[in-house]
């Protein structure tokens, strides 16, 4: 048994429809299709392979301990890129998303999952992998004067599982009140 999981935020359906419209436009206009193979999402923890049922239980338990958070409003605004390979919607680095990602990373650290976790730079990918430099430049030029702005309330996070060569929704972690977190409760408070 070996399963591949992705921890992420998935915007509401109305925003996903807007994002998919942009991704389809880019695919049709520039002949780059790789991003269409994945659901619209904001990665909170890079994909991780888990090879045993016991480790999978520990993984999901650790994630449940990271779900003690208060809802926050997330802003997606305008377009940006990682030079020459990835074009994306910019995701505001607000305290809510930064704290959530930090909690998830901290909760999973004891599992020693050995995934490459770079500095967290939240984004929602529109085109990557199959984007060659001349096409990348054309996409940037096409979108340089375009604007995009959507907000949504984040009240939990998702885990997707790679099944039959596709990422599929697998488990939801709705936020729980941080005051109910047994790990932070003071024994001597009332």
List the predicted regions and their residue ranges.
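Basic, often amphipathic N-terminal segments
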Residues: 1-73, 94-148, 164-190
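A short, structured active-site edge motif that brings together acidic residues
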Residues: 76-80
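Hydrophobic residues embedded in beta-strands of well-ordered beta-sheets
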Residues: 86-87, 167
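Active-site/acyl-donor-binding loops of N-acyltransferases
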Residues: 160
């Amino acid at each position: 048994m070996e399963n591949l999981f992705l921890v992420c935020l998935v915007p509401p359906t109305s925003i996903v429809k807007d994002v998919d419209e942009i991704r389809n436009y880019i695919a049709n206009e520039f002949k780059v299709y790789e991003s269409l193979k994945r659901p619209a999402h904001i990665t909170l923890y890079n994909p991780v392979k888990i090879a045993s049922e016991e480790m999978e239980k520990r993984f999901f338990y650790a994630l449940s301990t990271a779900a003690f958070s208060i809802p926050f409003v997330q802003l997606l605004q305008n377009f940006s890129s990682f030079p020459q390979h990835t074009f994306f919607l910019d995701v505001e680095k607000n305290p809510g998303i930064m704290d959530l990602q930090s909690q998830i990373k901290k909760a999973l650290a004891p599992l020693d999952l050995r995934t490459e976790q770079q500095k967290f730079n939240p984004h929602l990918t529109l085109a990557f992998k199959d984007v060659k430099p001349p096409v990348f430049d054309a996409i940037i030029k096409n979108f340089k004067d375009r604007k995009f702005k959507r907000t949504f309330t984040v009240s939990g996070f998702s885990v997707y599982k790679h099944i039959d060569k596709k990422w599929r929704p697998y488990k939801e972690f709705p936020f729980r009140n941080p005051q109910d977190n047994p790990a932070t409760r003071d024994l001597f408070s009332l």
